[in-house]
Amino acid sequence: MPDRKGDRGRHQARKRAVDLLFEAEARGITAAEVAEARNALAEKRTDDIATLNPYTVTVAQGVTAHAAHIDDLISAHLQGWTLDRLPAVDRAILRVAVWELLHAEDVPEPVAVDEAVELAKQLSTDDSPGFVNGVLGQVMLVTPQIRAAAAAMQGGHNGGSGT
């Protein structure tokens, strides 16, 4: 029987990462800075503030580190829209999902997309789940090439000759 509690924990971590990205954009800082500040506050106080789930921090740091590439990839697959015109929560959901598609090797692509659609159902407009699914479906088509190119570049930077 699968560990549904672990799945729920990862779902909550993604939702919290979306919250952090949303807050970061509203405050004009990075999600990594919000996560760092939140964990620092939790360490100083002993009341009801808990440290963030490590996966939430990983996602926040990953989206921050790869923000330009993630936004370019999302923008390339928006039809009739610009990233700035999307609801802020949809931007945050798409950023988390695209980071997972590109960088979370332990997350199967369909899981990343399904989780994003679920978050859109919970947090955004009635049209958002279908929109998020459509954009991520297009991103999934190019994900293997992007991962392969990143691996090739990584090999080249590690002194590999490629032959």
Swiss-Prot record:
Q: Which UniProt keywords apply?
A: RNA-binding, Transcription, Transcription antitermination, Transcription regulation
Q: Which GO terms describe its cellular component?
A: cytosol
Q: Which domain of life is it from?
A: Bacteria
Gene3D superfamilies named among the record's database cross-references: NusB-like
HAMAP family in UniProt: NusB
So what family is this one in? Belongs to the NusB family.
Protein role: Involved in transcription antitermination. Required for transcription of ribosomal RNA (rRNA) genes. Binds specifically to the boxA antiterminator sequence of the ribosomal RNA (rrn) operons.
Name the UniProt record assigns to this protein: Transcription antitermination protein NusB
Q: Which organism is it from?
A: Mycolicibacterium vanbaalenii (strain DSM 7251 / JCM 13017 / BCRC 16820 / KCTC 9966 / NRRL B-24157 / PYR-1) (Mycobacterium vanbaalenii)
Q: What is the lineage of its organism?
A: Bacteria, Bacillati, Actinomycetota, Actinomycetes, Mycobacteriales
